[in-house]
């Protein structure tokens, strides 16, 4: 059992070092291109590099987790409150069978966006506003972490 644990720890450390190396490559790309599209990956690499020292700072893990949840789960929470289920990365045949069994409807803009029911411009505007607010929250977190890193 000890040898297995040692191999698992070696594999974990190798992947950690690999992630940092990829982060370094991305940082070079971000410096050269400068368009900001790789900035989040650079941030993630720096957080990996910091390791445990981040836990000792005033910016605790719960704060980051709460903001991540705010960004990624907020639209899902809105759908849930409205009784709508969002399925991501599902095979379409499976979704069709699920809709048939549950009596639900599929809202997809892939083939015929004009057939999607229920979305008014007001709802779409509110959704866009909420996404922008979530993005502002994310930017705030990135700026705060950036201040710690420098």
Swiss-Prot record:
Residues that, per the record, bind ATP: 36-38
Entry-linked SUPFAM superfamilies: GroEL equatorial domain-like
EC numbers for this chain: 3.6.1.-
Reactions this protein catalyses: ATP + H2O = ADP + phosphate + H(+)
Binding site for ADP: 36-39
Class of enzymatic activity (EC top level): hydrolase
The keyword Hydrolase is assigned to this record: yes
Binding site for Mg(2+): 35
UniProt KW Secreted keyword: no
One term under GO cellular component: chaperonin-containing T-complex
Keyword list, A-Z: ATP-binding, Chaperone, Cytoplasm, Hydrolase, Magnesium, Metal-binding, Nucleotide-binding
Localization per Swiss-Prot or TrEMBL: Cytoplasm
GO molecular function: ATP binding; ATP hydrolysis activity; ATP-dependent protein folding chaperone; unfolded protein binding
Main localization (coarse): cytoplasm
Family (UniProt): Belongs to the TCP-1 chaperonin family.
Reported function: Component of the chaperonin-containing T-complex (TRiC), a molecular chaperone complex that assists the folding of actin, tubulin and other proteins upon ATP hydrolysis. The TRiC complex mediates the folding of WRAP53/TCAB1, thereby regulating telomere maintenance. As part of the TRiC complex may play a role in the assembly of BBSome, a complex involved in ciliogenesis regulating transports vesicles to the cilia.
Subunit structure: Component of the chaperonin-containing T-complex (TRiC), a hexadecamer composed of two identical back-to-back stacked rings enclosing a protein folding chamber. Each ring is made up of eight different subunits: TCP1/CCT1, CCT2, CCT3, CCT4, CCT5, CCT6A/CCT6, CCT7, CCT8. Interacts with PACRG. Interacts with FLCN. Interacts with DLEC1. Interacts with SVEP1.
PANTHER family (UniProt xref): CHAPERONIN
Record protein name field: T-complex protein 1 subunit beta
């Amino acid at each position: 059992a000890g040898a297995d644990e040692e191999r698992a720890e070696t594999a974990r450390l190798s992947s950690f070092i690999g992630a940092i190396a990829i982060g370094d490559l991305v940082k070079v790309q971000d410096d050269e291109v400068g368009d900001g599209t790789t900035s989040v990956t650079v941030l993630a690499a720096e957080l990996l590099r910091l390791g445990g020292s981040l836990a000792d700072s005033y910016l605790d893990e719960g704060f980051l987790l709460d903001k991540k949840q705010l960004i990624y789960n907020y639209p899902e929470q809105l759908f849930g409150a409205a009784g709508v289920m969002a399925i991501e990365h599902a095979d379409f045949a499976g979704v069709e069978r699920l809709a048939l069994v549950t009596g639900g409807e599929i809202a997809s803009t892939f083939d015929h966006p004009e057939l999607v029911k229920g979305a008014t411009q007001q709802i779409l505007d509110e959704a866009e506003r909420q996404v922008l607010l979530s993005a502002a929250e994310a930017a705030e977190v990135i700026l705060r972490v950036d201040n710690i890193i420098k």
